[in-house]
């Protein structure tokens, strides 16, 4: 503001206008900066969302791929084992389990030397870290082969579904995971179908039933404990496979020797048959592949899912089993029960593997003894 010589009072607005222009420019810069930051935040948020979606898609593919790999491996070894033990009348399922242990040790040992796989070296506390998996692993293998030898494949497949219920209960108790209502309904339907099929088993074999039920309990324990060890131990899936086989080799060899199975197997007259030898070696190698696929499937899925996928492959095994081995006796009630169990397996597969937009949520429960499914 200034006074003119003529005595008139006038206002000099130029400084005020200049200050206003500066303020407007500062405000525009702030607004522009805020908009830029907002766009940057929106861009980074969309990138994070896109990255998360890619990770979810990759995990989904791994879940499906590992489940299919396990199902195919389980199907192949069931058919090959049945051919060796029943069609060729190989006398010792214990010796066959020893061959499968040997194949796992040799393949993984060579793989580590060639740096194809990696796992920690043997230490004094290695056995304690993976216990009780070696015992479960050996028992599951031996009793599973025993059940395969003594029962027809359709009945073996039906009775194996009891392992699903056992796995579900163990997951609740040990891992604190409660299955959804749809999962529970499908599991109970599978068990009901298996019971219906077993009620009219015309080729009943008590020893085979005992073998399979022991295998069911061990399969459930194996799946749950593998999941637990993979989450809490640095040994990894290759280490679990290798040390399970390594620690149980000598006990399995001693058991073969004491029971006379070693002599029976070595004196088997079909060793000159090249087709049988190929089948036997394939059974040994498939034992290793099955162990790997089981751990891989359990790593990317739940132990219950791994168990159900193993039973889903029995859709093919059930019908092929009517012709493989020649020891299946057909009845309508048995067939209806088997198909109910198969349909329930398909229901569980749909419930478990359907793709969801939101991440799967599991209820973690306190490990109390009073909880029931």
Swiss-Prot record:
Which terms does the UniProt entry file under GO BP?
compound eye morphogenesis; embryonic pattern specification; imaginal disc pattern formation; imaginal disc-derived wing morphogenesis; nucleotide-sugar transmembrane transport; segment polarity determination; sensory organ development; UDP-galactose transmembrane transport
Its source organism is Drosophila melanogaster (Fruit fly)
**Subcellular location per the Swiss-Prot or TrEMBL entry:** Golgi apparatus membrane
The record describes the protein's role as: Involved in the import of UDP-sugars from the cytoplasm into the Golgi lumen.
This chain's protein is named UDP-sugar transporter UST74c
Tell me the protein family, please.
Answer: Belongs to the TPT transporter family. SLC35D subfamily.
Q: Which residues carry this modification: Phosphoserine?
A: 50
| Keyword Metal-binding attributed | no
- Where does the sequence pass through the membrane? 89-111, 131-153, 174-196, 206-225, 238-260, 275-297, 302-324, 329-351
Cite the PANTHER family for this sequence.
SOLUTE CARRIER FAMILY 35
State the residue spans of region: Disordered. Answer: 27-49
This protein's UniProt keywords: Golgi apparatus, Membrane, Phosphoprotein, Sugar transport, Transmembrane, Transmembrane helix, Transport
InterPro entries, per database record: Sugar_P_trans_dom (IPR004853), TPT_transporter (IPR050186)
GO molecular function per UniProt: antiporter activity; UDP-galactose transmembrane transporter activity; UDP-glucose transmembrane transporter activity; UDP-glucuronate transmembrane transporter activity; UDP-N-acetylgalactosamine transmembrane transporter activity; UDP-N-acetylglucosamine transmembrane transporter activity; UDP-xylose transmembrane transporter activity
Q: Name one GO cellular component term.
A: Golgi apparatus
One Pfam family name is TPT
Classify the protein's membrane topology as the record does. Answer: Multi-pass membrane protein
Name of the gene this protein is made from? frc
